[in-house]
Amino acid sequence: ADEGVAVMKIGADGGLTPLNQVGIDGMRGCFLSTDKAGKFLFVGGYHDGKVTVVHTHSDGRLGRVMDGIFHKGLGSVAERNFRPHISCVMPTPDNKFLCVVDSGVDHINIYTVNPTTGRLKMVDILRCELESAPRWIRFSRDGKFAYVICEHSNEILVYTYDGSGRLPEFELVQKVPTYLDNDESAKAASALKISPSGDYLYCSTAGEETV
């Protein structure tokens, strides 16, 4: 059964105290993020391809579901990606847009979030190569670059980002492989993180078992 999202308060000793729990009207969310103001929680659903917006209170508790959108479409790999699989939900650094990474249909859908109602409106789609399976997106510390790790193509896509206009502008400028060699063993790029200094980008690759 779907148990939604639970909130825990972190104590001074590191202990966790439950605050509350809310359902998301979807199947087992796999990724969480918040907007810069801490007003909304975004939930990505891998199994049902749903992005959910939940209101958050100032004390950390969760409120009601404000909006939810199911992605639609057929993926490029029928054996696995025959339907949408949302694997990451991440606001842009300027808090103007929400990037929803869908590894099932090789898309990154870009939404605006109404600051009052929490309603989502899709304004753009970044279309990645078929069978690449984009998994996570991260932004540079200065907010000028976006990095997307692709699970199937085992590469990191580098985009410039400009959110100064009414619509977001992403331009692909580089592709960097995540593997050490070109052997035929099964491998899948998985996670992506930027170092605190912003000087390094870390990624992990399953199968090859490397960082």
Task: Describe each PLM feature range.
Residues 17-88:
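Asp-box/WD-like beta-propeller blade repeats and closely related beta-sheet repeat scaffolds
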Residues 3-5, 49-52, 106-108, 154-156, ...:
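Structural signal for beta-propeller blades
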Residues 7-14, 53-63, 111-119, 159-169:
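Short loop/turn segments immediately following beta-strands, especially the blade-tip
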Residues 15-21, 62-65, 71-75, 116-129, ...:
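Blade-edge beta-strand/turn elements of extracellular beta-propeller
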Residues 1, 43-46, 92, 100-103, ...:
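Conserved beta-strand positions in repeat-built beta-propeller and related beta-rich domains
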Residues 37-39, 94-96, 142-144, 197-199:
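Short coil/turn segments that connect the beta-strands within blades of beta-propeller domains
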Residues 187-211:
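Loop/turn-rich, solvent-exposed surfaces of beta-rich toroidal or solenoidal domains
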